[in-house]
């Protein structure tokens, strides 16, 4: 049984909705028809959005790739001193090449690109990859964000295959296996459970971590819940902690 259906907002979006549904083998629902699945991919005039089919949720999920470049000076320059930037090794003019091996909805990956990193995003979940592609296409068309979008290469593929086949190894591999948090801008609790089912579990995370350690030229960064145990017996070289999360940093070179 499918957990996701595709619905056009109006008949003007019918053609694109049909294309998406056919390509991914998702059920297509007529405009304003009763949705037979708990999750709904809404094809609207401004793009794609993920919704809860019960209609109770008012904050659809999209890949919100907002904001332009963050330089060494300016109102947002303080971000370059935050734990994420320090974890991946952004310092002054140095902005490493990073593989975001679990891109998700692009939050951290976009922030790294804003700070100047050359990014490779890997996302194997078709729904997430589709939302990322949509977000990047919109960013390319926006004057403020186009420069950042050009720093990002999206790979709708398994990160293990990507790392095995890259001609030039990245300086950093970034792993964030945590699923999007509940709260403002997320789906209701029941729908989040269903979305996790749709995405599947990262059963191969230990294998991905080992490959990342063998591939990254400088370091592997693993984002974890603040109080979560270490992923492996190997201890990180250092940790950077925030309010609810931490970054375990493993040097490779």
Curated annotation (Swiss-Prot):
Its EC number is 2.1.1.242. It is found in: Cytoplasm. The keyword Cytoplasm applies. InterPro entries: 16SrRNA_methylTrfase_J, SAM-dependent_MTases_sf. GO terms for cellular component: cytoplasm. GO terms for molecular function: rRNA (guanine-N2-)-methyltransferase activity. S-adenosyl-L-methionine binds at residues 123-124, 176. Keywords: Cytoplasm, Methyltransferase, rRNA processing, S-adenosyl-L-methionine, Transferase. Its main location: cytoplasm. It holds the Pfam family SAM_MT. It catalyses: guanosine(1516) in 16S rRNA + S-adenosyl-L-methionine = N(2)-methylguanosine(1516) in 16S rRNA + S-adenosyl-L-homocysteine + H(+). It comes from the Bacteria. HAMAP family: 16SrRNA_methyltr_J (MF_01523). Specifically methylates the guanosine in position 1516 of 16S rRNA. Belongs to the methyltransferase superfamily. RsmJ family. This is Ribosomal RNA small subunit methyltransferase J. It comes from Magnetococcus marinus (strain ATCC BAA-1437 / JCM 17883 / MC-1). The lineage of its organism: Bacteria, Pseudomonadati, Pseudomonadota, Alphaproteobacteria, Magnetococcales. The gene is rsmJ.
């Amino acid at each position: 049984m499918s957990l996701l259906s595709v619905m056009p907002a109006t008949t003007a979006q019918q053609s694109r909705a049909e294309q998406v549904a056919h390509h991914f083998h998702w059920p297509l629902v007529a405009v304003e028809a009763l949705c037979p699945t708990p999750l709904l991919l809404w094809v609207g005039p401004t793009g794609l959005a993920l919704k809860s089919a019960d209609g109770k949720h008012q904050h659809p999920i999209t890949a919100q790739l907002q904001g332009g470049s963050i330089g060494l000076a300016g109102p947002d320059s303080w971000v370059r001193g935050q734990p994420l930037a320090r974890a991946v090794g952004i310092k002054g003019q140095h902005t490493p090449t990073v593989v975001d091996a679990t891109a998700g909805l692009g939050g951290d990956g976009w922030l790294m690109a804003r700070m100047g990193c050359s990014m490779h995003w890997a996302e194997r979940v078709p729904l997430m990859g589709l939302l990322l592609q949509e977000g990047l296409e919109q960013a390319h068309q926006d004057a403020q964000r186009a420069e950042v979008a050009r720093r990002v290469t999206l790979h709708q593929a398994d990160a293990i295959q990507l790392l095995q086949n890259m001609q030039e190894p990245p300086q950093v591999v970034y792993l964030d296996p945590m699923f999007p948090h509940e709260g403002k801008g997320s789906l209701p609790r029941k729908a989040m459970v269903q979305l996790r089912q749709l995405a599947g579990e990262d059963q191969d995370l230990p294998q991905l971590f080992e490959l990342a350690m063998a591939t990254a030229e400088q370091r592997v960064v693993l984002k974890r819940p603040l109080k979560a145990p270490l992923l492996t017996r190997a201890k990180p070289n250092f940790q950077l902690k925030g309010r609810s999360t931490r970054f375990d940093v493993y040097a490779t070179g």
